[in-house]
Design a protein with these regions (language model features):
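Residue-level marker for isolated small/hydroxyl-bearing positions within beta-strands
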Residues: 53, 102, 143, 181, ...
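Blade-level signature of beta-propeller repeat domains, shared across WD40, Kelch, NHL, RCC1
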Residues: 250-276
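Beta-rich, blade/repeat-based domains predominating
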Residues: 35-47, 64-65, 83-98, 124-140, ...
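Short loop/turn segments that connect beta-strands within beta-propeller blades
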Residues: 71-75, 111-116, 153-157, 190-194, ...
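Asp-box/WD-like beta-propeller blade repeats and closely related beta-sheet repeat scaffolds
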Residues: 25, 106-107, 112-137, 142-143
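Bacterial Sec-dependent N-terminal signal peptides
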Residues: 1-26
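Short glycine/acidic-enriched loop and turn motifs that connect beta-strands
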Residues: 56-60, 106, 147-148, 185-187, ...
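A short beta-strand motif characteristic of beta-propeller blades
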Residues: 26-32, 76-83, 116-122, 157-163, ...
Protein backbone atom coordinates (compact mmCIF):
# COMPACT_ATOMS: atom_id res chain seq x y z
CA UNK A 1 0.00 0.00 0.00
CA UNK A 2 2.83 2.36 0.87
CA UNK A 3 4.50 1.76 -2.51
CA UNK A 4 1.21 2.36 -4.26
CA UNK A 5 0.73 5.65 -2.39
CA UNK A 6 4.25 6.76 -3.27
CA UNK A 7 3.62 5.96 -6.92
CA UNK A 8 0.38 7.92 -6.93
CA UNK A 9 2.07 10.87 -5.23
CA UNK A 10 4.84 10.89 -7.82
CA UNK A 11 2.33 10.62 -10.63
CA UNK A 12 0.27 13.50 -9.30
CA UNK A 13 3.38 15.63 -8.81
CA UNK A 14 4.53 15.00 -12.36
CA UNK A 15 1.18 15.87 -13.84
CA UNK A 16 0.03 18.66 -11.55
CA UNK A 17 0.73 21.33 -14.16
CA UNK A 18 -0.70 19.48 -17.13
CA UNK A 19 -4.07 18.21 -15.95
CA UNK A 20 -6.52 18.41 -18.86
CA UNK A 21 -3.81 20.12 -20.92
CA UNK A 22 -2.96 19.08 -24.45
CA UNK A 23 0.26 21.08 -24.31
CA UNK A 24 2.95 20.67 -21.67
CA UNK A 25 6.24 22.15 -20.51
CA UNK A 26 9.03 19.85 -19.31
CA UNK A 27 12.14 21.29 -17.69
CA UNK A 28 15.39 20.68 -19.59
CA UNK A 29 17.88 22.68 -17.55
CA UNK A 30 18.27 25.67 -15.25
CA UNK A 31 21.19 28.06 -14.98
CA UNK A 32 22.97 28.76 -11.75
CA UNK A 33 21.09 31.25 -9.59
CA UNK A 34 23.64 34.01 -10.13
CA UNK A 35 21.94 36.13 -12.79
CA UNK A 36 21.02 39.48 -11.16
CA UNK A 37 17.24 39.76 -11.57
CA UNK A 38 16.72 38.39 -15.10
CA UNK A 39 13.59 39.98 -16.59
CA UNK A 40 13.67 39.05 -20.26
CA UNK A 41 15.22 36.45 -22.58
CA UNK A 42 15.93 37.03 -26.27
CA UNK A 43 16.83 33.90 -28.24
CA UNK A 44 19.20 34.60 -31.12
CA UNK A 45 19.10 31.84 -33.74
CA UNK A 46 22.00 33.39 -35.66
CA UNK A 47 24.68 32.96 -33.00
CA UNK A 48 22.76 30.45 -30.85
CA UNK A 49 22.95 32.59 -27.74
CA UNK A 50 20.41 33.65 -25.14
CA UNK A 51 20.56 37.37 -24.37
CA UNK A 52 19.34 38.14 -20.86
CA UNK A 53 18.07 41.54 -19.71
CA UNK A 54 19.20 41.91 -16.09
CA UNK A 55 17.67 44.54 -13.84
CA UNK A 56 20.01 44.00 -10.87
CA UNK A 57 17.97 46.30 -8.65
CA UNK A 58 14.50 47.82 -8.67
CA UNK A 59 12.39 47.50 -11.81
CA UNK A 60 11.82 51.22 -12.37
CA UNK A 61 14.99 52.70 -10.93
CA UNK A 62 17.63 54.52 -12.96
CA UNK A 63 20.67 53.25 -11.08
CA UNK A 64 23.03 52.27 -13.90
CA UNK A 65 23.28 48.71 -12.57
CA UNK A 66 21.35 47.02 -15.37
CA UNK A 67 23.04 44.85 -17.99
CA UNK A 68 22.56 42.45 -20.88
CA UNK A 69 24.17 39.06 -20.34
CA UNK A 70 24.85 36.02 -22.51
CA UNK A 71 23.91 32.42 -21.72
CA UNK A 72 24.60 29.36 -23.88
CA UNK A 73 21.89 27.02 -25.12
CA UNK A 74 23.22 24.48 -22.62
CA UNK A 75 22.38 26.79 -19.72
CA UNK A 76 25.97 27.76 -18.99
CA UNK A 77 26.61 31.42 -18.30
CA UNK A 78 28.96 33.03 -20.83
CA UNK A 79 29.10 36.70 -19.82
CA UNK A 80 26.78 38.57 -17.47
CA UNK A 81 28.13 41.96 -18.51
CA UNK A 82 28.12 41.87 -22.30
CA UNK A 83 26.44 45.29 -22.11
CA UNK A 84 26.65 47.23 -18.85
CA UNK A 85 25.60 50.68 -17.66
CA UNK A 86 21.89 50.25 -18.32
CA UNK A 87 19.22 50.96 -15.73
CA UNK A 88 16.46 48.35 -15.55
CA UNK A 89 16.43 46.72 -19.02
CA UNK A 90 13.45 44.61 -20.00
CA UNK A 91 12.02 43.68 -23.44
CA UNK A 92 14.39 43.24 -26.38
CA UNK A 93 14.22 42.91 -30.15
CA UNK A 94 16.72 42.64 -33.00
CA UNK A 95 16.61 44.61 -36.25
CA UNK A 96 19.45 44.11 -38.70
CA UNK A 97 22.70 44.40 -36.80
CA UNK A 98 21.17 46.18 -33.83
CA UNK A 99 19.55 45.10 -30.59
CA UNK A 100 16.86 47.37 -29.13
CA UNK A 101 16.07 47.34 -25.42
CA UNK A 102 13.31 48.94 -23.34
CA UNK A 103 15.05 50.64 -20.42
CA UNK A 104 12.74 52.55 -18.02
CA UNK A 105 12.24 55.72 -20.11
CA UNK A 106 14.55 55.06 -23.08
CA UNK A 107 14.73 52.74 -26.05
CA UNK A 108 18.40 51.76 -26.21
CA UNK A 109 20.08 50.85 -29.50
CA UNK A 110 23.03 48.45 -29.21
CA UNK A 111 25.47 47.16 -31.82
CA UNK A 112 24.78 43.43 -31.94
CA UNK A 113 28.38 42.44 -32.67
CA UNK A 114 30.30 44.64 -30.27
CA UNK A 115 27.74 45.26 -27.52
CA UNK A 116 28.42 48.99 -27.79
CA UNK A 117 25.54 51.33 -26.95
CA UNK A 118 24.96 53.37 -30.11
CA UNK A 119 22.04 55.58 -29.18
CA UNK A 120 19.24 56.16 -26.71
CA UNK A 121 15.78 57.30 -27.78
CA UNK A 122 13.99 59.03 -24.87
CA UNK A 123 10.26 58.33 -24.72
CA UNK A 124 8.61 61.55 -23.60
CA UNK A 125 6.51 61.35 -20.41
CA UNK A 126 7.19 57.62 -20.07
CA UNK A 127 7.58 56.02 -16.65
CA UNK A 128 7.99 52.25 -16.98
CA UNK A 129 8.90 50.99 -20.43
CA UNK A 130 8.43 47.25 -20.36
CA UNK A 131 8.23 45.05 -23.44
CA UNK A 132 9.39 45.65 -26.99
CA UNK A 133 8.61 44.10 -30.37
CA UNK A 134 9.57 44.83 -33.98
CA UNK A 135 7.35 44.26 -37.00
CA UNK A 136 8.33 43.18 -40.51
CA UNK A 137 8.59 46.81 -41.64
CA UNK A 138 11.10 47.71 -38.94
CA UNK A 139 8.67 49.59 -36.72
CA UNK A 140 9.59 49.27 -33.05
CA UNK A 141 6.82 49.16 -30.46
CA UNK A 142 7.33 49.51 -26.72
CA UNK A 143 4.81 49.30 -23.89
CA UNK A 144 4.70 51.69 -20.93
CA UNK A 145 2.90 49.87 -18.14
CA UNK A 146 2.61 52.86 -15.82
CA UNK A 147 1.15 55.32 -18.35
CA UNK A 148 -1.09 52.69 -20.03
CA UNK A 149 0.34 53.34 -23.51
CA UNK A 150 2.19 51.74 -26.39
CA UNK A 151 4.77 53.89 -28.17
CA UNK A 152 6.25 53.61 -31.66
CA UNK A 153 9.83 54.25 -32.77
CA UNK A 154 9.85 54.84 -36.52
CA UNK A 155 12.50 56.55 -38.64
CA UNK A 156 14.28 57.69 -35.50
CA UNK A 157 11.24 59.40 -34.00
CA UNK A 158 9.10 58.29 -31.07
CA UNK A 159 5.33 58.80 -30.97
CA UNK A 160 2.41 57.43 -28.98
CA UNK A 161 0.84 54.58 -30.94
CA UNK A 162 -2.04 53.50 -28.69
CA UNK A 163 -3.40 54.32 -25.25
CA UNK A 164 -6.42 53.73 -22.97
CA UNK A 165 -5.01 50.38 -21.83
CA UNK A 166 -5.04 49.11 -18.24
CA UNK A 167 -1.44 47.99 -17.70
CA UNK A 168 0.14 46.89 -20.98
CA UNK A 169 3.20 44.69 -20.90
CA UNK A 170 3.95 41.91 -23.38
CA UNK A 171 3.96 42.84 -27.08
CA UNK A 172 4.17 40.75 -30.23
CA UNK A 173 3.98 41.95 -33.82
CA UNK A 174 2.35 39.34 -36.07
CA UNK A 175 1.87 40.38 -39.69
CA UNK A 176 -0.13 43.64 -39.73
CA UNK A 177 -1.38 43.08 -36.16
CA UNK A 178 0.02 44.04 -32.78
CA UNK A 179 -0.75 41.71 -29.87
CA UNK A 180 -0.80 43.28 -26.42
CA UNK A 181 -0.92 41.59 -23.02
CA UNK A 182 -2.92 43.88 -20.78
CA UNK A 183 -3.53 42.94 -17.16
CA UNK A 184 -4.72 39.38 -17.76
CA UNK A 185 -6.09 39.86 -21.27
CA UNK A 186 -4.67 39.35 -24.76
CA UNK A 187 -5.71 42.12 -27.15
CA UNK A 188 -5.15 42.33 -30.89
CA UNK A 189 -4.79 45.67 -32.65
CA UNK A 190 -5.23 45.50 -36.41
CA UNK A 191 -3.54 47.85 -38.88
CA UNK A 192 -6.27 50.44 -38.22
CA UNK A 193 -5.72 50.16 -34.45
CA UNK A 194 -9.07 48.47 -33.96
CA UNK A 195 -8.86 46.39 -30.75
CA UNK A 196 -10.20 42.86 -30.40
CA UNK A 197 -9.94 40.88 -27.17
CA UNK A 198 -8.61 37.43 -28.02
CA UNK A 199 -8.47 35.96 -24.51
CA UNK A 200 -9.06 37.10 -20.95
CA UNK A 201 -9.12 35.76 -17.41
CA UNK A 202 -5.41 35.05 -17.12
CA UNK A 203 -3.35 36.10 -14.11
CA UNK A 204 -3.19 39.92 -13.96
CA UNK A 205 0.61 39.91 -14.24
CA UNK A 206 0.70 38.90 -17.92
CA UNK A 207 4.26 39.48 -19.07
CA UNK A 208 5.71 37.69 -22.12
CA UNK A 209 4.20 36.27 -25.32
CA UNK A 210 5.58 34.14 -28.15
CA UNK A 211 3.81 32.61 -31.15
CA UNK A 212 4.29 28.84 -31.41
CA UNK A 213 1.83 28.16 -34.27
CA UNK A 214 -0.33 30.51 -36.35
CA UNK A 215 -2.92 31.80 -33.89
CA UNK A 216 -1.45 29.90 -30.93
CA UNK A 217 0.71 31.45 -28.23
CA UNK A 218 2.58 30.79 -25.02
CA UNK A 219 1.91 33.53 -22.47
CA UNK A 220 3.88 34.00 -19.27
CA UNK A 221 2.74 35.88 -16.19
CA UNK A 222 5.28 37.41 -13.82
CA UNK A 223 3.62 35.90 -10.74
CA UNK A 224 4.66 32.39 -11.83
CA UNK A 225 2.19 30.93 -14.31
CA UNK A 226 2.39 30.12 -18.02
CA UNK A 227 -0.56 29.54 -20.35
CA UNK A 228 -1.09 28.10 -23.81
CA UNK A 229 -3.52 30.45 -25.55
CA UNK A 230 -5.38 30.01 -28.84
CA UNK A 231 -6.95 32.64 -31.07
CA UNK A 232 -10.43 31.32 -30.22
CA UNK A 233 -9.88 32.51 -26.64
CA UNK A 234 -9.28 29.09 -25.10
CA UNK A 235 -6.34 28.71 -22.76
CA UNK A 236 -4.53 26.00 -20.82
CA UNK A 237 -2.48 26.42 -17.67
CA UNK A 238 0.81 24.67 -18.43
CA UNK A 239 2.99 25.75 -15.52
CA UNK A 240 2.51 27.13 -12.02
CA UNK A 241 5.63 27.89 -9.98
CA UNK A 242 4.08 30.33 -7.53
CA UNK A 243 4.35 27.94 -4.59
CA UNK A 244 8.10 27.72 -5.20
CA UNK A 245 8.39 31.51 -5.29
CA UNK A 246 9.75 31.36 -8.83
CA UNK A 247 8.65 34.05 -11.26
CA UNK A 248 7.99 33.51 -14.96
CA UNK A 249 8.82 36.85 -16.56
CA UNK A 250 9.37 37.80 -20.24
CA UNK A 251 10.01 34.54 -22.09
CA UNK A 252 12.15 33.71 -25.12
CA UNK A 253 11.47 30.96 -27.65
CA UNK A 254 13.38 28.68 -30.00
CA UNK A 255 10.75 27.90 -32.63
CA UNK A 256 12.81 25.18 -34.32
CA UNK A 257 13.39 23.11 -31.18
CA UNK A 258 10.21 24.29 -29.42
CA UNK A 259 12.06 25.37 -26.29
CA UNK A 260 10.69 28.09 -24.02
CA UNK A 261 13.27 30.06 -22.01
CA UNK A 262 11.94 31.47 -18.75
CA UNK A 263 13.65 34.19 -16.67
CA UNK A 264 12.80 33.61 -13.01
CA UNK A 265 13.40 37.20 -11.87
CA UNK A 266 13.77 36.98 -8.07
CA UNK A 267 15.20 33.44 -8.31
CA UNK A 268 18.08 34.85 -10.40
CA UNK A 269 18.10 32.10 -13.01
CA UNK A 270 16.83 31.12 -16.45
CA UNK A 271 15.02 27.81 -16.96
CA UNK A 272 14.59 26.02 -20.30
CA UNK A 273 11.41 24.02 -20.94
CA UNK A 274 10.52 21.68 -23.77
CA UNK A 275 7.12 22.50 -25.22
CA UNK A 276 5.11 19.45 -26.26
Amino acid sequence: MKSKNLFLTALLTASVFSVNAQNTLTEIWATEGTIPVPESVFYSAGDKILYIAQIDGKSGEKDGKGAIGKVGLDGKIIDLNWVSGLNAPKGMGKLGGKLYVADVTDIVEIDFKSGKILQKYPVEDSKFLNDLTIDSKGNIYVSDSDTHKVHLLKDGKVSTYYETLTRPNGLLAVGPDLLILDSGSLIKLDANKKPTTIAEGMDKSTDGIVEVKPGEYVVSCWAGVIYYVKSDGSKELMLDTKAAGSNTADIGYDAKKKIVYVPTFLKNSVVAYQLK
